[in-house]
Amino acid sequence: MVHITRFEAPWFLKVGKKEYKWIIRSRAGPHKIQESVPLAILLKYYLKAVDTTREAKRIIFDGKVLVDGKVRRDYKYPVGLMDVVEIPSADLRVRIIPDNVRYLTTINISREDAKYKFVRIMNKTTLKSGVLQLNLEDGRNILLKGEELSQYNLPTLTTLKIELPEQKITTAYTIKEGVYAMIIGGRNAGLHGKISKIQLAKYKRIKYSLVTLEGKDGSTFQTNLINVMAIGENEADSNLGVKL
């Protein structure tokens, strides 16, 4: 299915419900359909880089749009959490981050910040010859062996800061008390602060463990562990591109 009605579209999409009946549907890809924005919609409604869907399709087909350092020519390509979208000809670079109102939003970032992607480890697989495969949240995989294996054999939900498009790991942030984190899902999505307490569940820890964060203003908020993304040590990583 190429299109869906606007009333069937994910609730958070920034599109007018009465403009047209049909709207572009995300293609299956690195992000779930209900957690992503089709690339053409991102250009038109979020970035205001074009006036019409036809214009969006044209610059995408012409190879002028990059997602995570790679040219994407599919106007239905799903763009999601922490993706880096660039239009070099327009000197435009943005990162997709969680938002407390609209679930996903964009922030402008510098050329230096656009070199880095932040993504969580969701699970790990041991392959032949002792190679460890890290399966990341956006569908990509990283193979570790030798010194890298001992250095980056980290717990699931650890956030990796990787260079684009080579996928070289530069930094890792593990979820623990004291680190700076952002909530990426649930009713508190978009809120951020230091992790002050982690209450581990007896079973299904990733799903049911409860994490308490403290904002810079002293406010506290809670969410399940699966909704937490570590983004720095004492404060947010400078290359995230957002001032928190």
Swiss-Prot record:
Residues 37-123 form the S4 RNA-binding domain. GO terms for biological process: translation. GO terms for cellular component: cytosolic small ribosomal subunit. The keyword Mitochondrion does not apply. InterPro entries: KOW, Rib_uL2_dom2, Ribosomal_eS4, Ribosomal_eS4_central_region, Ribosomal_eS4_central_sf, Ribosomal_eS4_KOW, S4_RNA-bd, S4_RNA-bd_sf. Pfam families: Ribosomal_S4e, S4. Keywords: Ribonucleoprotein, Ribosomal protein, RNA-binding, rRNA-binding. Coiled coil: none annotated. PROSITE patterns: S4 (PS50889). GO terms for molecular function: rRNA binding; structural constituent of ribosome. Belongs to the eukaryotic ribosomal protein eS4 family. NCBIfam families: PRK04313.1 (NF003312). This is Small ribosomal subunit protein eS4. It comes from Sulfolobus acidocaldarius (strain ATCC 33909 / DSM 639 / JCM 8929 / NBRC 15157 / NCIMB 11770).
